């Protein structure tokens, strides 16, 4: 009688592990990645708030889109990634001798790397954006709040 329950439990466990269900060690890694993402977003925000040249001042006029639904899950980070790619194109952050521009590029590269790691193999999510746009500082503040929320639910 207990054999069937035991076999069912084993089968369910194997199915969860095979489908990438979070384990305690992966949760710890996710927390570290979310914390790193949060720090990089905060660093980027500080650089954006204090532009030192005209090229960066264009960032303040750029309109960003936020997800239509309130971002509450890691899959929503795909929306952040898509908007950062657009910003990078607008700023044309090619290799530069300007330290501020290089630091912004490094922060954006770190953010993209971390988001890709957090997403893993999940590629099915499609971002739906709100019609209203926000400026760079508000955009980054909203994603910082998102990361803080995710981090606090994991602790």
Swiss-Prot record:
UniProt-listed PANTHER family: INTERLEUKIN-2
InterPro entries assigned: 4_helix_cytokine-like_core, IL-2, IL-2_CS
Gene3D superfamilies named among the record's database cross-references: 1.20.1250.10
Biological process (GO), any one: negative regulation of B cell apoptotic process
Record Pfam families: IL2
Known glycosylation sites: 23
Identification of the protein by name: Interleukin-2
Secretion signal, residue range per the UniProt entry: 1-20
One cellular component term from this protein's GO annotations in UniProt: extracellular space
Role played: Cytokine produced by activated CD4-positive helper T-cells and to a lesser extend activated CD8-positive T-cells and natural killer (NK) cells that plays pivotal roles in the immune response and tolerance. Binds to a receptor complex composed of either the high-affinity trimeric IL-2R (IL2RA/CD25, IL2RB/CD122 and IL2RG/CD132) or the low-affinity dimeric IL-2R (IL2RB and IL2RG). Interaction with the receptor leads to oligomerization and conformation changes in the IL-2R subunits resulting in downstream signaling starting with phosphorylation of JAK1 and JAK3.
Family to which the UniProt record says this protein belongs: Belongs to the IL-2 family.
Disulfide bonds: 79-127
Record's subcellular location: Secreted
Coiled-coil annotated residue ranges, if any: none
Origin: domain of life: Eukaryota
Keyword set, alphabetical order: Adaptive immunity, Cytokine, Disulfide bond, Glycoprotein, Growth factor, Immunity, Secreted, Signal
Molecular function per GO: cytokine activity; growth factor activity; interleukin-2 receptor binding
């Amino acid at each position: 009688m207990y054999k069937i329950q035991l076999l069912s439990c084993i089968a369910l466990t194997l199915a969860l592990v095979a489908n990438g269900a979070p384990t305690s060690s992966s949760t710890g890694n996710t927390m570290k990645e979310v914390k790193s993402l949060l720090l990089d977003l905060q660093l980027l925000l500080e650089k954006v708030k204090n532009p030192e040249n005209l090229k960066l001042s264009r960032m303040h006029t750029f309109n960003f889109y936020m997800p239509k639904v309130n971002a509450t899950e890691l899959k929503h980070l795909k929306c952040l990634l898509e908007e950062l790619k657009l910003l990078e194109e607008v700023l044309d952050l090619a290799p530069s001798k300007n330290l501020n521009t290089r630091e912004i590029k490094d922060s954006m590269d770190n953010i993209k790397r971390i988001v890709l790691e957090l997403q893993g193999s999940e590629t099915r999510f499609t971002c739906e954006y709100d019609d209203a746009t926000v400026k760079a500082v508000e955009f980054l503040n909203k994603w910082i709040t998102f990361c803080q929320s995710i981090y606090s639910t994991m602790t």
